[in-house]
Amino acid sequence: AKLPDAEKSVITDSDKVIATLNSLCIEMDNRYALLAKANVRTIKEYNEEFIHRKLNPNNGHKFMPYIVVIIDEFADLIMMAGRDVEMPIARIAQKARAVGIHMIIATQRPSTTVITGNIKANFPARIAFRVMQMVDSRTILDAPGANQLIGRGDMLFTEGGDLKRIQCAFIDTPEVKRICEYISKQQGYPEPYELPEYKNPDSDAG
């Protein structure tokens, strides 16, 4: 998925990141409106209704693909974009999963200035690899333990309950390329899914 004026789905410009996150919030609200119009509660129920031709495209209905948003090095994004990204990220994490929009954030600096209480409250599923201090483990997992991991993929996982210790698989570059090639050969959309256009109200005011 991408913005209408974007060339690629991978974004590094902070202004475009803010626009994309707010666009995803618009997409989320639009999807909830369609679910309400179709009298269903989840994207799975909605798509089944659409596939079985119980929803008329002339009334605005359309098939909803799943969207996964991945933010690599969340701390850098906070430094570049400030808190402009925190509100849309919290909204997406809190509500969007029911309409097929999922979010993964990653950071190597798990401080409380990066992972705020608002962010933590909306990400019940968390993974921690080895960290240097117990306070970092508590910031991620609300529990100690990640500071005692041995590295090399050793990690702790929680969904808001008990901690589970898991061994993460190592995937090298050639394997990543083979996975990408396999995905690219699958039947799918001929072009990326376009997100709604987002207009920054501050730019209009100027």
Name each region found by the language model.
Residues 1-2, 6-206:
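P-loop NTPase motor-domain active sites and their immediate coupling elements
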